[in-house]
A protein has these predicted regions:
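Functionally critical transmembrane alpha-helices in membrane proteins and complexes, commonly lining
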Residues: 14-90, 112, 317
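Structural signal for the C-terminal ends of transmembrane alpha-helices
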Residues: 86-93, 122-127, 183-192, 226-237, ...
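Interfacial loop-to-helix transition and helix-capping segments at the boundaries
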Residues: 11-14, 62-74, 161-172, 208-224, ...
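Membrane-interface helix-loop-helix regions
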Residues: 45-69, 108-174, 178, 283-295
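Transmembrane alpha-helical segments and their boundary/interface "anchor" motifs
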Residues: 19-20, 69-81, 85-128, 137, ...
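Alpha-helical transmembrane segments of multi-pass integral membrane proteins
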Residues: 63, 253-365
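Short, Lys/Arg-rich, polar N-terminal cytosolic tail immediately upstream
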Residues: 1-15
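Solvent-exposed interhelical
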Residues: 174-203, 230-246
Length: 387
């Protein structure tokens, strides 16, 4: 991400690495808290399914939901993907699309294949159960891999099996990666209309949320990242001008970002009918977009995202995202008679260690392989042209 940003003249993308790391940690917290049946009931019911202790109630139905807003963190990943994949295209005249496709697919599918095999191994070694005592989220995880489920998880584009639930987002990552030239063809012309087009993208997400049409909901989120890349310098200039001399400006932006990102849960807590609140989930899109902008241009948040810890989290974020959930579930089944806190205490450190190893031994190697594949395609193309 940082290299892509440098290539496009956007040197502050290092802070977005840290933001991505923070979002990955939020996803881990999200799945850890879903081990508690009461919070899993909140997540699936979207309402006060039962009386919660005050702090748990605040975690569920207030802006504090941000600390375990796993779904909204995935929206942030989608915006970042649109931004990061577009910047190198804009920076290089005559961008080599023939090299891009194999490079991108190796980069995505290599770690996914390894993660699926690891997840299948955890299911084999630690059998799963559908006992109601585990709560809704755990019970909804299938107990075994079938051949059909394995094919779904290894190919992604037709949907995933739910054995490793974070894989659902990779379906949309792959589709967006394949459709990136189409996004650019649609969004690069008529740049003066970008404000209207951003509003139209949010409107499409609203329609997708209202009609439960996943394509209409998810694919426009990537487009907002593409528009952000197209207007990067303009956004930076406007952010500097608008916040100059206004100490309250960035705090206000961050408050609005958090309120929008958690809007569905805040509204539920205020008594809004849960089905209506779920249809307002699209409000998280402008919220996570504001977080991306703030991480790039707000000095305080940028400094936080550039700390060593969040930079490390950003480096292992993809690996952590892929491997953590089967490990947490295995820890819960191994400690079934005890509180979910014990599963969290055991599972989270193991997941972090496995993620670090996975990043070094799997993800980084496929990243290097993807670069070699891209260079090989370019070299063959040059040879063919010279011949």
């Amino acid at each position: 991400m940082s290299a892509a940003g440098a290539a496009a003249g956007a040197p502050r993308l290092r802070s977005l690495d840290g933001l991505r790391g923070a979002a990955a940690l939020v996803v881990v917290v999200h799945h850890a808290l879903l081990l508690f049946p009461a919070l899993a009931g909140v997540y699936y019911a979207g309402r006060r399914a039962e009386v919660l202790p005050p702090f748990a109630d605040a975690l569920a139905y207030s802006p504090l939901h941000l600390v375990w807003a796993g779904t909204e963190s995935v929206y942030l990943f989608f915006v970042l993907s649109g931004l990061v994949l577009t910047l190198p295209v804009l920076a290089r005249p005559g961008f080599d699309w023939l090299a891009y496709y194999p490079r991108r697919l190796v980069r995505l599918y290599g770690p996914v294949v390894a993660a699926v095999l690891l997840g299948a191994l955890t299911i084999l070694l630690v059998p799963r159960s559908n006992d109601d005592l585990f709560g809704t989220w755990v019970v909804r995880r299938p107990n075994a891999y079938t051949l059909e489920a394995l094919v779904d998880d290894l190919t992604l584009v037709a949907g995933t099996s739910g054995r490793i639930s974070p894989l659902w987002s990779l379906q949309w990552e792959v589709l967006f990666s394949l459709l990136l030239p189409v996004y650019l063809l649609l969004l690069v012309p008529a740049r003066r209309l970008d404000g209207w087009r951003a509003a139209a993208l949010v409107a499409l997400c609203a329609v997708g949320a209202a009609t439960s049409t996943q394509t209409l909901f998810y694919l426009p989120i990537f487009a907002l990242g593409v528009l952000t890349a197209l207007n990067w310098r303009t956004l930076e200039d406007r952010a500097q001008r608008w916040t100059a001399g206004r100490r309250w400006a960035w705090p206000l932006v961050l408050v609005v970002a958090v309120l929008l990102t958690t809007a569905r849960w805040n509204l539920t807590g205020l008594g809004v009918d849960p089905p209506l609140a779920s249809r307002l989930a699209f409000l998280a899109l402008p919220g996570v977009w504001l977080l991306v902008v703030a991480a790039a241009f707000c000095p305080a948040l940028r400094a936080l995202c550039e700390t060593a810890f969040l930079q490390w989290a950003g480096r292992v974020s993809f690996s952590l995202y892929l491997v953590h959930e089967p490990i947490l579930l295995a820890a819960r089944f191994l400690t079934a008679p005890a509180s979910p806190w014990l599963a969290i205490a055991l599972g989270v450190p193991v997941a972090v260690v496995v993620a670090v190893l996975f990043e070094r031994l799997v993800e980084s190697r496929f990243h290097r392989l993807a670069q070699r594949v891209g260079r090989a395609v370019k070299a063959r193309r040059r040879v063919a042209q010279e011949a």
